[in-house]
């Protein structure tokens, strides 16, 4: 922060508060910075004529073993076992929804943009093998996918700020409630 830098001797004129610079690329003045839907779809073997639905995931705890959750809980001094259970149940139910939806809607390409903390997941591989219109893609920035997508869904991600800055809206998919202490305040009062 500016105050911290100034407290360490930096001149105030050299510490302007500008906001989140990385969000500037989502401003209208930067239109053209990101690839358009057709270019992005072709790059990843998706049909650009279909609806491009983006799901921004953040099920980082779902891929952790109980032992890993216990170790993390011990290090942090907070019990994450309930939140890990919420992650697992939410992911399982969300993927079941996607399975049914994609079976009924072959006109949709669904890109599952996993969170960097999500590890290899057998359930994702199985759904991708079953549904040719389900794609687990981590390449490119979440901003790139947000800009190109026709529709967006989120479970619980700070990427909701990028969605807003891109001038888009999103659906919040929550098959089960998230514990209050883990739910980002930006979602308070949201309908889902």
Regions found by a protein language model. Give the residues of each.
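A nucleotide-sugar donor-handling region in carbohydrate enzymes
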Residues: 1-80
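Structural motif
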Residues: 52, 109, 150-151
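Short acidic alpha-helix that forms the nucleotide-activated donor recognition element
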Residues: 140-150, 165
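Catalytic binding pocket for nucleotide-activated donors in carbohydrate/polymer assembly enzymes
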Residues: 12, 125-131, 151, 158-192
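A short acidic, glycine-rich active-site loop
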Residues: 78-90, 190-191
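Short, charged/polar "capping" segments at the starts of alpha-helices
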Residues: 2-4, 63-64, 118-125, 178-181
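A conserved mid-protein helix/loop that constitutes part of the nucleotide-sugar donor-binding site
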Residues: 63-69, 86-97
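Catalytic donor nucleotide-activated moiety binding site of glycosyltransferases and closely related
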Residues: 55, 89-137
């Amino acid at each position: 922060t500016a105050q911290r830098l100034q407290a360490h001797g930096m001149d105030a004129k050299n510490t302007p508060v500008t906001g989140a610079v990385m969000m500037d690329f989502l401003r209208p003045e930067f239109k053209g910075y990101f690839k358009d839907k057709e270019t992005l779809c072709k790059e990843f073997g998706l049909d650009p004529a279909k609806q491009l639905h983006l799901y921004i995931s953040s099920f980082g705890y779902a891929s952790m073993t109980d032992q890993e959750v216990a170790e993390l809980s011990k290090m942090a001094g907070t019990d994450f076992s309930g939140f890990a259970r919420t992650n697992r149940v939410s992911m399982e139910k969300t993927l079941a929804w996607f399975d049914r939806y994609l079976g009924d809607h072959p006109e949709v390409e669904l890109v599952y943009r996993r969170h960097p903390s999500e590890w290899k997941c057998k359930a994702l591989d199985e759904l991708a093998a079953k549904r040719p219109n389900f794609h687990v893609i981590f390449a490119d920035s979440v901003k790139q996918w947000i800009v190109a997508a026709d529709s967006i869904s989120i479970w619980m991600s700070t990427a909701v700020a990028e969605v807003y800055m891109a001038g888009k809206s999103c659906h919040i998919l929550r098959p089960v409630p998230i514990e209050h202490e883990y739910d980002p305040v930006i979602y308070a009062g949201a309908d889902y």
